[in-house]
Amino acid sequence: GEYMIRGLTVFTENIDDPAAAVAEVQAQLEKGPALLKNSVGIIACHYEFVLSGTAKAVCESLPFDVAGTISSLQAAGETRGTLLLTILILTSDDVSFKTLITSSLKDEPGKRIEESYKAASGGEKPSLIFAYAPFMLENSGDGYVEVLTRVSGGVPCFGTLAVDDTSDFRECYMVYNGEHYRDKMSLILFYGDVNPRFYLAAISENKLLDRAALITSSEGHILKEVNGRPVVEYFEDLGLTKASETSYAMTSLPFMLDYGDGTPMVSKVFIGLNEEKNAICAGIMPEGSTLYMGVFDKEDVLFTSGKIIAQALSEIENPSVLLGYSCISRNMSMGSDLFAEVDLIQKEIAGKVPALLAYSGGEICPTQINAAAAINRFHNNTFILCVF
């Protein structure tokens, strides 16, 4: 068919020899389809590639901008691995791409994103935004999404926060043209008729516990009371006190948040309890919304991801490119079977569509697109997919 955007993937496993990595990527480019007038690259790589200088060398060898993140596990085409550098190249004669990097988001992140966006877009409204950010505990993904939606006038946003495989997430960089950053966001702005399709897998409805909890007191992403009682009592009721007091065990307690405004529920996680025994959440918890705790397991992750990829491939005739991000918690639920989710998705794609898959520290994806504006959301525990 007639493709507005074509895609191809390149990869290297060569961490320590930048020249060899560049040669490998160039050879793959030469074998692939010719690049069209406008191109942009989306990178996902293990942090060792930025520390060794290989990511920088590879990006500098390419005649277009490259933006993306560190990831703990990547897949490109039919290759997958943890110690991998992958780039999905989007190329088009009709669609053009602008990239930007913000100033530091350490203070007033909303203001910094807004300034950078306005300068780069020059008042021209894009048709799609891809967003890439480091993992910064002090900033909320909801905050990023809220400001991008507002300043763009409701343009669909899709993207990811970085995630690594260290125990304390210390190497979670955003990567832009080969440089790596702990405190800046990059954006790819699309101009032209892109017509992306978005898909989202969270927990199956039958995995939700039927104990709804109305949020009666909260402050930003700190949850204080549900159903008029301290949140710690809610965990006691559910028999989850031990989990709630264990660092990182909280991330295996997903919940769906219903904002009560008719928009689809959004998957969120708890990060832990603070000294006051309030729950710290990965996202803003508005008073008056309702949360439904869920049960998270390998079987359901594979079921929901498999369902979404099969749906996308059956609904879209001749898809030209596929980009997917899956939450690190989905990967953790695989246990020792590290590649199970990626293998399932790659098997469905069967090499027919250029695809990049990577793990994520938080997913940005619209839950609805309507004529007026996209409802962009920040998710946890999800597998998100953008297909052209």
Model-derived features with residue positions:
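Small-residue-enriched flexible segments
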Residues: 3-40, 44-65, 69-335, 339-348, ...
